[in-house]
Amino acid sequence: PPPHPKHSFPTRRSSDLDWVAVGENRVAITFTPADQSLNRRDEFLYTLLVPDRARTVFPCFDQPDMKSFFTLTLEVPSTWQAVANGAITQTDSTSVSGRNRISFKETEPLSTYLFSFVAGKLTREVYSRNGRDISIYHRETDPKKIAQCPAIADEVFDALEWQEDFTGIPYPFAKYDVIILPGFQYGGMEHTGATLYTDRRMFLDEHPTLNERLSRSSLIAHETSHMWFGDYVTMKWFDDVWTKEVFANYFASRIVEPLYPDVNHRLNFIRDYIPASYSEDRTSGANPIKQDLDNLRNAGLVYGNIIYDKSPVIMEMLVRVLGEDAFQQGIREYLTTYAYGNATWEGLIRILNKYTEEDLAAWSEVWVNQKGMPEITASVKDGELVVEQRDPLGRGLKWPQELTYRVICGTDSEEIPVSLEGNSDSFRMKLSFLPNGNCVILPNINGRGYGFFKITEGESSGLWSVLRSSEDEVLKGSLLITLYENLRWKTISPQGFREEMLAYLPNESNSLLFSMALSYLGDCQRIFPSDSRPLEQVLWKIVTTNPVSQHRLQAFRLYRSIADSEEAVQRLYTLWQERKAPKDCTLSESDYIGLSYMLAMHLPEKADKIIATQLSRIQNPDRKKEYQFISPSVSPRKEERDSVFASLLIAGNRRVEPWASSALAHLNHRLREQESVAYIRPALEAMPEVQRTGDIFFPTAWVRSLLSAHTSKEARKEVDAFFTAHPDFPLMLSNKIKQQASHLY
């Protein structure tokens, strides 16, 4: 828009009207930005203002439904690059030698949390496709990682083109630049024109696993989808922040499909979202997808697995209710209606209601506005399959959804569609055959259902048998989730789960299923500790004999994590010392760094030498600084570890949040559990300050790093004592603690 006419303010104020003129007014303010959200390092800085930190950089009404046009001028060292939401319009030298003044073009309408700039010693790469340019800025020094930039740019182009085709709306902003930063707090952040990404997920090791490649592709697709869902159309208030995250993750899963034609994407969707959602939804700290938000200062606490992972599962249900064509029409109308503006979930539902006879508001009330999930059981009675749901929280809720079961009785088998209605607790259907003896009931065989599919120890044997023999990858993924959830709900035993998984894992050839099973096996050992030697033996055999090299690498990483026996630790020490990995198990620098931390804790007499040696091996200056920050947390000297912990209670020492989280996790490593129980109370006491000074994911990362390795009664007592001492502790912070402490109960 044209510049506003400048109004001359009187030197003395006689009334409020003296300060305003008829028509548009302009206010000019001189201010000094606070440092909190400038993320300063020695050679670069960047803004990160989501959800309510713009006010720490410049005076503003800091809420998402007040959008503005931004212009920016930066003065920086002449050796630095700068990038912002708008394109550079002019670069001038200043009167101060060695400094430049860089001016940027005015932006489209943006919410304050999307305002962004980055400045520093950065390398720039430029890529073009069909008349569109993308710049990638980074600080990487490894030529093999820098060589990945063309592939990164290609995936950005692919995601932009996919969304343009689906939405029918050309990319709604002037440019799309990528900045890849070391130590960045999140996977990515969707600032228009200046999208930030973490180097940990963008620059992959020389031999990345399928999981790592899919993760990068999904991240790029997620942040790119935000350009339409979050930036172009923004939530009115942060209680609806999930409405941008649900679309970003749901569409990310679809955008990556053509990039990986050999991947089972139905299985990948299940694997990506359902386990992560259950990890919070099963706990006493569960929250609804849409949460009440009293004040924007608490907006960061709305974020979590429920809005990132449960919501795309629910969105997929909604798409099935509407049908693909109706869904696409509704989404296009939604984007057109609220272009460059703000919307609510209720507004979207009103639009989608035009395309279906279903009562979407009633459906949404249960799935979106209520926390938790149904407990679902199944049995065969009088020749019928009987499926029942109940609300474990006693509210009498009924979750409408379509499920698919399979009943196997001897040589007879039948697949049965199950419809749980919003007004019914049960479903019954006559089997097409006469049951003879015990039947195996396989729940949720296509993975499209959501809930706790409860089984007994006796019933689990049938599921394990099918898991070992079936060739249906989606069925196997769903069974793995069901079995693990029953382990966590303590309806089946850790010993039985561990034994069955050790028998199953070496024979699984599908990489997605292998990674799921490996993760679940590691969790079982972490939460229900037992003699590690049987697990070590199976894992090392996979490391040395498995025909799939990425399976060897993934097994090695779990082996490193759980190794306890003298034989295993010595084997790892020799491997680290000689830098000689097993055949077809290529280890990266980050693998050796992780190994050095683990060895320093297992071998206290060699710890100082291990750390010094590993530090000398690291060449990249950013990674060297990270190692110097984290390595004191694995010191063999308790007084040094106590000093590290005390330092983390000071906000300034937590500024690089991934480093702080890693240090806290090492302080609370299972090998230090007895001594680190003393850290629990003060770290929990610090949670309000951690939230106030940290970014949106940091409170969860903080408490996860603190508690995840603890399994003792003493640790549980510390958590209980904390809540007893703080009966009025803020609900949203309490939920974060309860979600990460659930394994203690």
Descriptions of predicted regions:
Residues 1-3, 7-14:
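Short, small-residue-biased leader/transition segments that mark boundaries at the very start
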Residues 2-4, 167-169, 185, 430-431:
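Short, flexible, glycine/charge-rich loop motifs used to bind or transfer phosphoryl groups or to couple energy/partner
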Residues 7-9, 97, 131, 190, ...:
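Short, solvent-exposed coil/turn segments
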Residues 12, 176, 441-443:
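Generic beta-strand hydrophobic packing signal
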Residues 12-174, 200, 303-307, 320-325, ...:
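Acidic/His-enriched low-complexity segments
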Residues 48, 73-76, 81, 140, ...:
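Non-catalytic accessory/interaction domains
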Residues 48, 127-133, 195-196, 282-288, ...:
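Short alpha-helical hairpin
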Residues 104, 136-398, 533-538, 549-550, ...:
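Hydrophobic alpha-helical and helix-loop surface patches within well-folded domains
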